[in-house]
């Protein structure tokens, strides 16, 4: 699932917990993105990956018991057809090759708002009811595109930029690093977690504070 795995994995843990009331599920996500470093390649995507990616791990416990930090109120995913060439990996003899298309930021800027609105509608919510996004910071231009698509003032996604600066893009765990910093600041009443991944996909999950 790539970068979308943090949101999708946590949503899966929530469904497993709901299927077994009283159970506790430990969700763990680990990514070693440094395997994308290719000293044998001068491909621009490989150079970007070397500069952008980092290794990381994150975990969260999901249960139907206790208040916790927030309730998972819903989740969803949008997959766009004929977009496999936008983002992903190729397996080559010397190692993994990253697929990054320049179309990613403009695609997000064009498509994200409708995808978010559709996911929220299924959850019985609207964009106006969301206090903050908690986004996977795929790159500086991706963060800029999210702010533009969602009509947010420039600089709104400050924690996303901080995590990207401090840790790099760690793929799936990265959005949980952003959530951690949001918790330290004080979690708003309703937060929509989002992440993009190969497919091209957008995963979303709604958190609501008790």
Regions found by a protein language model. Give the residues of each.
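Short coil/turn connectors at secondary-structure junctions
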Residues: 19-25, 47-48, 56-57, 66-69, ...
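Alpha-helical metal-binding/catalytic segments enriched in His/Glu/Asp
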Residues: 6, 10-11, 31, 59-61
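Active-site-adjacent elements of ketosynthase-type condensing enzymes
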Residues: 27-48, 74-93, 139-148, 169-177
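Claisen-condensing/thiolase-fold acyl-transfer catalytic domains that form or cleave C-C bonds
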Residues: 1-18, 109, 113, 127, ...
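Conserved A3 ("GATE") glycine/threonine-rich loop of ANL adenylate-forming enzymes
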Residues: 3, 32-33, 54-55, 199
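Condensing-enzyme catalytic core mediating Claisen C-C bond formation in acyl metabolism
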Residues: 39-110, 114-117, 196, 208-210
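Short beta-strand segments
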Residues: 24-31, 62, 193-197
